[in-house]
């Protein structure tokens, strides 16, 4: 089977400044929030510090685990030995056992791909690429037109913060946390460290959808899938969007103990991806006036 993979991480700064003040594309949590453990309270992933630095640390663990090989860290004792020094270096030694248990849950959680029992720890390195780079040109692409298209055809057309008027010029580039292949279908997987609440129940489908809308992750996963669409189109002779694209997996990692595992699956319609492909290629496109 053909795999695409080369090395590198997401930016999406090109669209960041088009959001109203206080809203940012592809942003998890900007504010650091540390709530000390009360005496006798056991650490849990729901109590782990929040903010950019802890979020980057959690993302980094998954990136390193991918490089190590997810399967190699499924052994609990090996995972603890691997994780402990990394926590110590950050001054989070008291969280080492908690994070080791949490990482084990992530690796062993079935249902990574919808309709399957696949777990992250079962993926061989030949079936995924961590931090995959993408890049494509933009010439006077209307940001608000992108916004209208994406809003109409994702998340049931629900309201979300609008992008400000502007045009994209130059190279649009970024990095995808993980691209994986399973049974001939390709998925983009993005790790999210957002804190949605203090319990597993706070990571409901509705809560995750609200987070997607609030942070405009719809734009993020649409561009990821556009990049994947273009790469597969170039490398698979028989490529077909409906057959080969599995969609976007958003993993709200603090909710791994929720009934749904904190996993959110989105798959925009072929029409949207192909329309955006033409738009970035400088071809005229028609507006889409229906929700999907």
Which residues fall in each region the model found?
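Structural signature of nuclease core domains in nucleic-acid processing machines
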Residues: 1-292
């Amino acid at each position: 089977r053909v795999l695409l993979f080369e090395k590198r991480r997401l930016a999406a700064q090109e669209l960041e400044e088009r959001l109203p003040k206080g809203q940012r594309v592809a942003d998890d949590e900007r504010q650091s929030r540390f709530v000390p453990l009360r005496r006798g309270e056991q650490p849990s992933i729901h109590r782990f510090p929040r903010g950019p630095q802890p979020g980057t640390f959690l993302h980094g663990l998954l990136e390193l685990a991918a490089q190590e090989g997810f399967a190699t860290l499924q052994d609990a004792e090996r995972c603890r030995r691997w994780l402990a020094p990394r926590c110590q270096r950050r001054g989070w030694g008291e969280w080492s056992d908690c994070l080791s248990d949490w990482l084990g849950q992530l690796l062993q959680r079935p249902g990574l791909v919808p309709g399957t029992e696949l777990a992250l720890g079962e993926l061989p390195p030949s079936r995924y690429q961590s931090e995959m780079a993408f890049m494509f040109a933009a010439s006077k692409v209307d940001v608000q037109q992108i916004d209208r298209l994406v809003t109409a055809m994702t998340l049931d057309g629900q309201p979300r913060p609008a992008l400000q008027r502007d045009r994209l010029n130059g190279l649009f580039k970024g990095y995808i946390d993980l691209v994986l292949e399973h049974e001939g279908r390709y998925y983009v997987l993005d790790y999210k460290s957002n804190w949605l609440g203090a319990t597993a129940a706070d990571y409901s489908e509705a809560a995750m959808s609200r987070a997607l809308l609030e942070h405009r992750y719809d734009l993020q996963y649409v561009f990821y899938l556009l990049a994947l669409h273009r790469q597969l189109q170039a490398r698979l002779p028989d490529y077909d969007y409906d057959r080969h694209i599995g969609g976007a997996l958003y993993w709200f990692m603090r909710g791994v103990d929720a009934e749904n595992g904190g996993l959110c699956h989105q798959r925009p319609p072929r029409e949207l991806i192909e329309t955006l492909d033409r738009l970035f290629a400088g071809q005229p496109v028609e507006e889409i006036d229906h929700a999907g």
